[in-house]
Amino acid sequence: MASPSGQYIFGEFSDDEFKQFFVTARCTVELPPYNEHFFPCGPQSSGDFQDDMHLKFSEVIHGISGEDCPRIEFGIEEVIDHSTALPNNTDYSISSNLNPQAPEFILTCSSSPKTSNNVLHENNFDAINCQFSECAIPDGSGNADSDGTSGTGQRERKKKKKRPPGYYSYLEGVGDVPSETLVNGHANSTGLNSISTDDPDLAEDIPISTTSPRTCNSPDNFVDLNNEALSNDASMHNALDNARTAGQPEECSVTSSEQSCIPSDNGRESPVRTAVVQPFAGTDTTENLGVTNGQTLESSEEGTASNGVVLLPEVSSLSEEAKPEETSTAQAVVHLPGSASANPPAKSWASLFHNSKPSSTTQVAYVETKNATPVTSPQVTEKQVEIKEGPVPVSEDPVAIKIAELLEEVKLVHKPVSLQPRGLINKGNWCYINATLQALVACPPMYHLMKSIPVYTKAQRPCTSTPMIDSFVRLMNEFTNMPILPKAKQASGEKVIRDIRPGAPFEPAYIYRLLTVFKSSLSEKGRQEDAEEYLGFILNGLHEEMLSLKKLLLPQNDKIHINNGPDPVSEKEEINKDEQEGSDEEWEQVGPRHKSSVTRQADFVQTPITDIFGGHMRSVVYQQSSKESATLQPFFTLQLDIQSEKIRTVQDALESLVARESVQGYTTKTKQEVEICRRVTLEELPPVLVLHLKRFVFEKTGGCQKLIKNIEYPVDLEISKDLLSPGVKSKIFKGQRTYRLFAVVYHHGNSATGGHYTTDVFQIGLNGWLRIDDQTVKVINQYQVVKQTVERTAYLLYYRRVDLL
């Protein structure tokens, strides 16, 4: 850096430089008209400086116009008094038609570490007109002088005089380390470039640039790319003498020019006094360490900035290691007041020459960018948690092992629970879901199972491997217990109605979202769906999630095949398989009268869901002169065919289920047609038996049609021994095959592709029945449950074993 006795910005132009800047048609300088106002310049002790500057300036002007010009001296050490100065008057301004985008436009980008004292004393600069707008000077009374001596600062504040705006705009960009000189509006890519910082960690983290040493010494000030000039007297002098490439071609995009040459409103400070381009609202300026010295501009792009701005990428670790004093400085930078202060700044002319030599120990680097696009802080990006759609694997869920251990030791509770009824809001065609949910809530073992699983918040469990379990745990916790009424009140229906106070209805949107999470065919909103299909979706989904949790508790060499039953095959394919040689899943079983049969069982692992709803059926194939072939298949619902005219009751449908049927057209390996028969029996009865009355059938002429016929169903259902497999008839007692109705899901309407679903549930606290139609809840009598109409027909029947009541 040059000393005070050195040469200044307007001295010693070379011939090429003089012609380039002051002779070409685009580089004329318009002087203001002569005025009687006289501005004393600088400290009184610096008379030589004033004379030299005036002489050199006069020589320059004389070379341009060929005429002698009046002596106009400018001072830079006094705060401009907005009440007396005329910053916007053209009589006191110097304008130029220098094109900022032309090769002749040279800027020196200098920077140095700044304290809050120096940061607060900047002016708003219009890079297009080369003028300063009115600056907002904060209160600097509490700041020390830049040279460290309070006496000197006090004396210099008294000597400051007015200056026309814009003349010393090139003195605003400063720094104490070698920095990039922007020639032709951009940085050279072959020399070292610097933007200094007080934090030594920054120098270690930022890569070193290899650009050419087009740098200059600069006084102690900072660079505001929106509002400040980018040079000073010594830095411009060095740039002109040592690093001038005025003839170098340059392209400056309109976008870049708009960003770097935005004039500030007169009399008002820029909202954010940083190098961050103001339109980028998404940029976090307070967390960027570069904001503390007003030097950096965030960017994620590479290359040369189209507006010639040297960009420093934000280092995420830098913000975390920022010093407290730097943080406070950043706050001072951002929250500048909008009004000017009457107190003079603590800045002096002599301070421009202090600490001006480059630092040999500080490592600096820069990143050039062509497109100054808005970017977010890398620090925020690193902290963002990756959000995955759908469930995560159980291995990535830290809570999964806890739930697995809980489910492994859980014991089902069948004790009835009295819950305060709540309706479910239906904003779409979700009635088939709402009806199914009300039936499951009324199922005591299902309710107790879900209540035994703890509820985890998003903070405790940001990702889950069991979204379906989580949703039903949340659903059951929506309902609270209701005290059981005395028997005296139960005798009067009027009193019961007055005592039943349903809770506020709610929308189980988290249940609806499960259809999307699992990409089910049921996920299309507004589509009329089937309640039995949805029940199967729920029970199978819960079962599979529990199987995944169960794997965590088994050795790695033990594998569980998630399979609720064998793949569906036709009757002929199944019979052909029976003739093949036996496998590990087959065994020979001796039945009554010493008849033997080969039995196959599908892979099946028990879970709490199968312990509640799971049963087994035995399908036996009889063939003359061959052993019986049997297959055990699990089920969650019993599918009852009611199409036959003979079927009028549920008992009729159950007997039809186990009736022996003949299979026509079956041939053996020798292609001989033989007569075979098939029969299905109940091998194992579940605690909760769900009967599906198959009302929707396909006809060859009319497609899918609804069977509108009344099927009688009792409140207490006894499973006949004739329905049981021969091997279990003597093992299942009457109490284990007697069931009581606790929920009925109805389908309303005559169409198979439309209609509505409602549910009747038994309320133990009421000792009666409730009819729930979405968010409507009302009390009904038992005879209304079993009585069907043409418009409302039973579709799903939920029974509980009486020995578990």
UniProtKB/Swiss-Prot annotation:
Segments of skewed composition (Basic and acidic residues): 569-580
EC number: 3.4.19.12
Location(s), subcellular: Cytoplasm; Nucleus
Catalytic activity: Thiol-dependent hydrolysis of ester, thioester, amide, peptide and isopeptide bonds formed by the C-terminal Gly of ubiquitin (a 76-residue protein attached to proteins as an intracellular targeting signal)
Residues annotated as catalytic: C431 (nucleophile), H756 (proton acceptor)
Stretch list, region Disordered: 139-170, 561-593
One annotated GO biological process: cellular response to interleukin-1
Keyword Cytoplasm: yes
GO (cellular component) term, any one: nucleus
SUPFAM superfamilies: Cysteine proteinases
Ranges where the USP domain occurs: 422-802
Principal location: cytoplasm
Biased composition range(s): Polar residues: 143-153
Broad enzyme group: hydrolase
InterPro entries associated with the record: Papain-like_cys_pep_sf (IPR038765), Peptidase_C19 (IPR050164), Peptidase_C19_UCH (IPR001394), USP_CS (IPR018200), USP_dom (IPR028889)
PROSITE patterns assigned: USP_1 (PS00972), USP_2 (PS00973), USP_3 (PS50235)
Key words, A-Z: Autophagy, Cytoplasm, DNA damage, DNA repair, Hydrolase, Nucleus, Protease, Thiol protease, Ubl conjugation pathway
Function: Hydrolase that can remove conjugated ubiquitin from target proteins such as p53/tp53, rps2/us5, rps3/us3, rps10/eS10, becn1, snx3 and cftr. Acts as an essential regulator of p53/tp53 stability: in unstressed cells, specifically deubiquitinates p53/tp53 in the cytoplasm, leading to counteracts MDM2 action and stabilize p53/tp53. Following DNA damage, translocates to the nucleus and deubiquitinates p53/tp53, leading to regulate the p53/TP53-dependent DNA damage response. Component of a regulatory loop that controls autophagy and p53/tp53 levels.
Protein name per the record: Ubiquitin carboxyl-terminal hydrolase 10
Organism of provenance: Xenopus tropicalis
